[in-house]
Amino acid sequence: MGIRNLTEWNDPIFRKTSRTVEKFDERLWNLLDDMRDTLEKVNGYGCAAVHIGVLRRIVVVNDDNGVIELINPTITDASEETQEVQEGSIAPGAPRGYVIRPKSVTVSALDRNGNPTTVSGADFLAATFCHEIDHLDGILFTDKVRKKNI
């Protein structure tokens, strides 16, 4: 497939709401493969489609067990227990900062074939799910930052 160019951090596209995916076809599969390749190239933890200029509700997350693809994801459960996590972005020019996130979350989504799937994550994986899903609604981690990391 291919490696896509990343959208610059200050691009206004990051403030837009991504659209729901309705077609599960070769075009979507190519996009998912490109997102995986791009994430691997930059050695990142997560990539929302908006990172490559596509306003679709798609997230790809790197996990110890491989890459998790989430289409139209929704956080369906979040722990009351929280954690402070240092976050940044694969977007060029992004700052870093500390954000409070749930310690664990459960996400409902669709897989690349349109089948329902549920994944759970704790610690950094939970924070990554939250961070990337926020992007789909035009929310940046800097909106939630408690202290910046200079």
Language-model regions, residue ranges each:
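Positively charged
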Residues: 1-150
